[in-house]
A protein has these predicted regions:
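Alpha-helix-centered segments that form part of catalytic cores
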Residues: 1-9
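Short, solvent-exposed coil/turn elements at secondary-structure transition points
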Residues: 3-4, 19, 80, 158
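Metallo-beta-lactamase
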Residues: 10-100
């Protein structure tokens, strides 16, 4: 199906790329939007500090689409349902933007794992194994975006690929 298609005779499909490569949600005929992990509740953002996503630009575009979506209720997978998704989308956008700046600033001839380690140390807590894997994936997505934007360079070093802010 494509975004906007009616699925099963009643659900309108939503394109929610960003958290995952091909994530979708649905809007019911009575205006309830099931938005999955495309937007997280503020308590989840505060608790974890690193939302999982695989495509930074698409995650931001999805937040834009959610803000423009007409629905009476938005139901995220993690967080309470809300009638107005805009404050939640803005909170998610702030966290993503801040994380991008932080990762860019940590690109000082560090490996990806060095960047993840520096972020973990700065937060003052150690991630469990699952959180560590999710954190690495999000940092990898940001490094890809920063490389595409020409804001960092990558080079080979004895410890592996290292990233340097331009």
């Amino acid at each position: 199906f494509d975004p906007g298609d009616v699925v099963g005779g009643c659900l309108r499909a939503l394109d929610l790329k960003g958290h995952m490569v091909a994530m979708a949600g649905a809007v019911t005929p009575d205006g309830v939007a099931f938005v999955g992990d495309s937007v997280l509740g503020e308590e989840i953002l505060a608790k974890h500090g690193v939302p999982f996503f695989v495509d930074y630009p698409q995650a931001l575009k999805t937040l834009d689409r959610l803000e423009a979506l007409e629905a009476r209720l938005f139901v995220p997978s993690h967080g309470e349902p809300v009638g107005d998704v805009r404050p939640l989308a803005e909170a998610n956008r702030r966290v993503l933007s801040s994380l991008r700046e932080e990762v860019r600033d940590l690109c000082r001839l560090r490996t990806r794992d060095g960047i993840v380690g520096a972020r973990t140390a700065a937060r003052g807590r150690k991630d469990d194994l699952v959180a560590e894997v999710l954190h690495r994936a999000s940092v990898s997505a940001l490094l890809s975006d920063l490389l595409d934007a020409g804001e960092v360079q990558v080079q080979e070093a004895p410890e592996g690929l290292v990233y340097q802010r331009v």
